[in-house]
């Protein structure tokens, strides 16, 4: 696709306007607490922005348009499932998590299951989110290389630079500010594009004449089981992710945490629909293109150049903001749950730089890993990420929330260990080809129910 000077200028201004508030917010960061949880003073808007900045990534925009090109409404599951997961998080998890005044998921699990659970949770969450960073980086790398026609090394430099500008100096506050601006850009460009695509297809009547009702207008275009697995995976993945929990920890109080999470859910749910419309429009008018190019090609071809540039900026910020938010989550766990346990006499400035350098290390490590696996499948890393996060975090955390202090600690640790083992080795030891997240959750539930029945007696 050919970009004009107007596209480039509009895109550059969009990136600058989005990055600037976050960089200005960095001036208020004086400690690791300010960096990791915004000094626990975030309002509902910043909580929502932090969540949106990470969850609305390349999968919610480019990936949704790609699947919309192939299957229609089935592609909505990513943002619909994310929104449902965030509503559950707001209803059941936000208040007890914020009330704890902690910083990481591992710290929360330690309160019920002891120190061994903290190490297992740190491994599970860090490894799981790292592979999610890998998946997002792989997508962003090829997107930038294809969009601007630059070599992969130059694309890698752009990814690292923008990722660090988003979170290296300002941490969670910068991520939240960028998230707020990003959603405004998406509504201003991709939503406009989605409505125009819908209108150009002849509205509902024209679409029903051009597409068969199944699979194009069904959420279960690949079957009921596939749809329910998609929903379940999103719930497990969102609730198990440090970055979203970290946003709740940053809220000024429990009510703000719940309201911010709920606001994020209500914004995230409809975000996928315009991308679906654009994907279907491109399938109808350009069936010969590579499906992953559906959204950027539409923005360049069918929108005014200045608006198309804004849309491309929103797409890039979606992909790179997700990487930045996830890297911040992993960096926080490394600095809080590992470095702080080793570097006991660290000063406030030392703790702050430990957090920043952890984010840098995660970003660079993910890029190096991607270059070692350039031909790998994004979906492969997403599956591994989901299995690792869900196996060590989701059900143990859920039992902590619903049955606080009632599960025997040794069984909680056993549940986490067995789940992580299943996530890592199931496909190597089992004759059944199923997603390793399912057996991991079964192992979790088995030990947690025993621990709940056994109780805390004798511990």
Residue ranges and their predicted role:
Residues 1-459:
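Membrane-embedded helix-loop-helix hairpins and adjacent transmembrane boundary segments
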